[in-house]
Amino acid sequence: MKTEIAFWDTSAALPLCCSQTFTTQSKKWLRKYPKIVVWWGTSVEINRGLARLKRDGHLTEKETIKAARLWEKLKKTCRVVSPVERVLELANGLPENYGLRALDSFQLAAALVWCQEKPRRRPFITADERLAIAAEKAGFNEILLA
């Protein structure tokens, strides 16, 4: 059975919206895994990322608006993992167990909730090496954009 669904963390989703180092790779993986699962807080992280890229001079105002619109369109097709209590419970233990930062802990916890805590090598797409290692240790098939 072909798996067309994958969990995407923000570092993998942002390059789908604007030209970045991993845009080509992200688009390649989107063709393979067109059904995207994201954490509830991903939109905030995407908007923060776009604001940072604009502030740092990597995006113009026009490019930022276009990228934000693209994210809004893409977001409508995503399955979003809500901030349920179990996400918080899992996220609380992940920094110690996997050495993750707080927001990355929410990403991995959301992915675990998505699969009922049975990753079974489901795809987890990220450009963050530390998060990729943690996802693999948790049982996901980590796809590191590099």
Please describe what each predicted stretch is.
Residues 1-5, 109, 113-146:
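Acidic, PIN/NYN-like endoribonuclease modules and their adjacent C-terminal/linker elements
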Residues 42-43, 73-98, 105-110:
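Acidic catalytic patch
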Residues 52-84:
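Helix-adjacent hinge/juxtasegments
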Residues 1-43, 53-66, 140:
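Short, well-structured N-terminal submotif of metal-dependent ribonuclease cores
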Residues 8, 38, 82, 102-105, ...:
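Short beta-strand scaffold positions
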Residues 15, 24, 89, 132-133:
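Alpha-helical elements of the RecA-like P-loop NTPase motor core of helicases
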